[in-house]
Each structure stands twice: as C-alpha cells, then as structure tokens.
A protein has these predicted regions:
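Extracytoplasmic gate region of multi-pass secondary transporters
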Residues: 41-45, 222-276
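Conserved MFS/SLC helix-loop-helix module at the cytosolic interface between two early adjacent transmembrane helices
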Residues: 72-110
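Helix-to-loop junctions at the C-terminal end of transmembrane segments
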Residues: 73-85, 274-287, 372
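A late C-terminal transmembrane helix in Major Facilitator Superfamily
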Residues: 340-375
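Extracytoplasmic
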Residues: 21-56, 74-77, 163, 242-247
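Cytoplasmic helix-loop-helix junction between adjacent transmembrane helices
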Residues: 117-153, 342
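C-terminal transmembrane helical hairpin of 12-TM major facilitator-type secondary transporters
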Residues: 267, 271, 285-336
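Helix-loop-helix hairpin linking two adjacent transmembrane segments in secondary transporters
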Residues: 142, 151-201
C-alpha cells in the first residue's frame, strides 16, 4: 500500500455509521487522561518524595511499572476492541483510572503506591492513544489519518494544559489532595464522554485483503511485521531517551536550566507542527519509504544534537526539528498496521506492535541515565542513540508485506 486510501484497508463504513461526537470527545478525553494519569506525575514527584521520604528511584520505578503493565495489557485490550468496539473498554478504563489515581493519592506506603500505579497501567492501556486510534480507524475508514491527526494534535496539549494546572494546585494543596482533585476531574470529564460519545454501532471488520496472510496470527508471525516491530521498538527506545536527556545535554552545552526547559517545551510544539504535516507526507510517499525516512531523520537530529557544540539558539532549533520528527513518528506508528495489513485486525496487531515500544519507552530513561557515565557524557549518549535509530531505519526496509 502506497497511500492513505489504500483500497485493501477500507472499512466499508460510511459517514452514517460515524458517530459525530466521537472525535471531539476523544480529543477532550485524551487531553484529560494523558494530563492527569501521565503528566501530573513528573510535576508532583519531587513533592511526593519530599513528603514521604521515598526515593526518587523508587517512585519513578512505580511509574515505569505502570508503563510496563500498559504494554502487556494493551494486547488483550486490542482483541476486545476488534470484537466489541471502544465504548466499554474506554469507559471501564476511565473508571479504573479514577480508582487508581485516588489510590495513588492516599497510598499509605510505597508498596501501596506502587500497586496503585500498576493499576493505573491498566487504565493507560484502555484510555490512551491505542483504543482511541482503534476506534477512529474503524469508524473513519479511508479518512482515518485526518481523524488520527486531529486527536494526536489534541493529545499534544495534555502537558500544556495539565502540567501548569497541576503545579498551580500543588502550590495551594498537598500532593495527595492535588491528586484527589485531579481524580474528580478525570471522573467528571472522561467517564460520561466515553459512555455517551462512543455509543454508535461497531461496524464489522472488513475482509482481509486477498493478497495478505489470513488471520492476525499469520501477520504477527510474518517477517515484515517482526522487522517493523523491531524497528519501532529501537526507535521508541532512542526517542524516549532523547526526550529525557535533552535538558541535561543542553545544560552541559552551556544553556541555563530555564532555557533548556524551554527547548524541551518548544520540542513539544515541534511535535504538534510535525503532526500537521503527516497527511501531506503520507499522500506523497509509500509506507516503507516514509518509515525508513522518518526513522533516519530521527537519528539524524539526534546525531546533530550530540555533535553540534552550539550556540544554544542553534541547539534549540535542533530540538524543535527533533520534535517535528517525533510528531510524525506518532502518526506513523498509528497507521503502520492499516497501511500494510488493512483494518481487519487493527486492535490486536496494533496492540502487539505497541507493547515492545511501550516497554522500550519505560526502560529508556533508566538505561539512558545508566549509560551516560560510562560513555563519558550526554553527547556520547546521543551519538549512541543516533546509531540505534539508524539500525531501526535499516530494519524498516524489510517491513513491506510481500
């Protein structure tokens, strides 16, 4: 398949079966779910450790555990999505998320805190991008990339909206009360939105294109799928490690902490800009070509960040460029299954594809920090991560179905 409207990926659903409220509702719930369940933690973690005496390593490990649970849970969630649609999955996920955030807020000890985060990982699998992408892919058919772009643009605002809100609440409330307030917001916004806006009939899966393997199992065991999974996993590791290590890299290069933080924030703005360009890119390129190119571009920006000594404004520009590539890569992964194997088994296959990527993202911050010392600094770490991205790009060459 070489374009967005790959005929074998058509769902057969028309505008009549498309719930009008689903897209705006998912935009709002992605902002809220990501903002509360994910982005509130880095804002509150210093207060949590100061209040409880738990180590930063221990609290961060609990958070990473949630990401690992999300990766593992995403596979069965994908199967349910394929069969039954997103309403029950995402509504239940919101309920679990509220319970988990309240449990985090009132955890009396580190073990309870960790258990609450593991429960939050289940909520992540049922409410974050994966189920939203599955819903939009089935309902929007050949127009899915437009819908996916809109919801990822909205999701990119989660940190913009909830990081300052969380910080503001924490200035006046304890971290526990702040989390309790956020849990109420999560309940009020996401539970009714998922329960009411996703009520449309779930269209039957389209038939598998005749030239492709029959059944999701055959696809999942195929060489192109395994190479694609390996490529995206390596890229995910490099991408998450770069994001976490960007601020210390820039401070090593002479940027003050405020400027380095702004560079990270502007990189997020670059992600949003990059996502607006993906539809045009996908129309003009074959799926394997753009996969290889975007992974290579990601490695290129990482290499430049690792080798260009300055000045700081140039490094900020490179951070924005890296963000633009990351924004495209989000949509590349969202459409990787449909552009190659159609929508028939999207939920399960995308869950299988996302699981190792999520695990890599959970491991990357710790691995990056552990490697920085032996390698001799963040510049050397970025050079290594660029090589990892280059390997990912080479693996992606073989991801085209036969």
């Amino acid at each position: 398949m070489t374009s967005l409207d790959a005929r074998g990926a058509a769902t057969g659903t028309g505008d009549r079966s498309r719930p009008r409220a689903a897209l705006p509702a998912l935009c709002v719930t992605q902002i809220t779910s990501w903002g509360i369940v994910y982005y509130a933690f880095p804002v509150l973690n210093a207060r949590i450790t100061a209040d409880t005496g738990w180590s930063t390593t221990a609290t961060t490990a609990a958070f990473s555990g949630a990401l690992l649970v999300s990766a593992l849970t995403g596979i069965p969630v994908g199967r349910i999505l394929d069969r039954r649609g997103p309403r029950a999955v995402m509504t239940t996920g919101s309920l679990i998320g509220v319970v988990a955030v309240l449990a985090i807020a009132y955890a009396p000890d580190l073990a309870s805190f960790t258990a609450a985060w593991l429960l939050a990982g289940v909520a992540m699998a049922a409410t974050f991008y994966h189920p939203a992408f599955a819903a939009l892919t089935r309902w929007w058919g050949e127009q899915r990339v437009r819908a996916l772009t809109i919801v990822t643009l909205a999701g990119g605002l989660a940190s913009t909206a909830f990081a300052p809100l969380t910080a503001l609440l924490a200035e006046h409330l304890s971290w526990r009360t702040t989390y309790a307030v956020l849990a109420v917001l999560l309940a009020v916004i996401t539970i009714p939105a998922h329960a009411t806006a996703l009520r449309a009939p779930w269209p039957p899966a389209p038939p598998q294109p005749a030239r492709l393997p029959h059944g999701s199992g055959s696809v999942a065991r195929s060489r192109p799928f395994l190479l694609l999974a390996a490529a995206l996993t390596l890229n995910g590791f490099a991408m998450y490690a770069v994001v976490i290590a960007l601020v210390p890299l820039l401070t090593e290069r002479g940027a003050d902490p405020t400027t380095a933080a702004w560079a990270l924030g502007l990189g997020g703005a670059g992600q949003t800009l990059g996502r607006t360009l993906y539809t045009s890119l996908a129309r003009r390129t074959a799926v394997t070509t753009r996969t290889v190119a975007l992974l290579a571009l990601g490695g290129g920006t990482t290499a430049l960040l690792g080798t260009v000594p300055g000045p700081v404004p140039l490094l900020v520009v490179l951070a924005i460029a890296a963000g633009m590539v990351r924004g495209n890569l989000t949509l590349l992964q969202a459409t990787a299954v449909t552009d190659r194997w159609g929508t028939t088994h999207y939920g399960r296959l995308s869950g299988l594809l996302a699981a190792p990527v999520t695990v890599a993202g959970a491991v990357a911050p710790f691995a990056g920090a552990a490697l920085t010392g032996p390698l001799g600094g963040h510049a050397q770490l970025f050079t290594l991560l660029a090589i990892v991205s280059a390997c990912a790009s080479l693996l992606a060459v073989g991801s085209r179905p036969g």
